[in-house]
């Protein structure tokens, strides 16, 4: 028998969570499909451009929003490259019910996954505390180096 899973949270192998990430997210999952927390970044040598988390770009305050509010903010702030994998916790039963999976062998699968996940949600908990550190490194698909 497969274990009972309440929530799922993703992490890239070169990133890390704050020690209290899970403990902070679980109580906020009550009545929502997703908890969206903030991220900060660490740049490897050679990166000069700035990176801001999507949550900072949306400038949302802590609390529950409807999916429609997220969509309206996306349109009003002209945020067309939305991605979501490692910046939140997802209700696992909800994820199974909507049958959303990552697309194999394509770049930026987190964009497709994130947009569909948020579009199908009813409620999203905005948690503007930085619970995740994102390491931007050489040869990353984000490619923020000056050699663009």
Residue ranges of model-derived segments:
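Nucleotide-sugar donor-binding/catalytic module of glycosyltransferases
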Residues: 1-148
């Amino acid at each position: 028998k497969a274990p009972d899973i309440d929530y799922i949270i993703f992490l890239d192998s070169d990133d890390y969570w704050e020690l209290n990430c899970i403990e902070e997210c679980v109580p906020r999952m009550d009545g929502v499909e997703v908890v969206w927390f903030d991220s900060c970044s660490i740049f490897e040598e050679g990166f000069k451009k700035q990176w801001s988390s999507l949550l900072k770009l949306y400038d949302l305050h802590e609390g529950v929003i409807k999916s429609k509010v997220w969509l309206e903010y996306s349109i009003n702030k002209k945020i067309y490259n939305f991605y979501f994998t490692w910046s939140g916790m997802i209700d696992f039963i909800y994820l199974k019910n909507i049958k959303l999976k990552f697309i194999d062998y394509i770049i930026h699968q987190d964009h497709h996954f994130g947009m569909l996940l948020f579009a199908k949600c009813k409620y999203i908990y905005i948690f503007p505390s930085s619970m995740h550190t994102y390491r931007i490194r050489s040869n990353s698909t984000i490619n923020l180096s000056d050699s663009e």
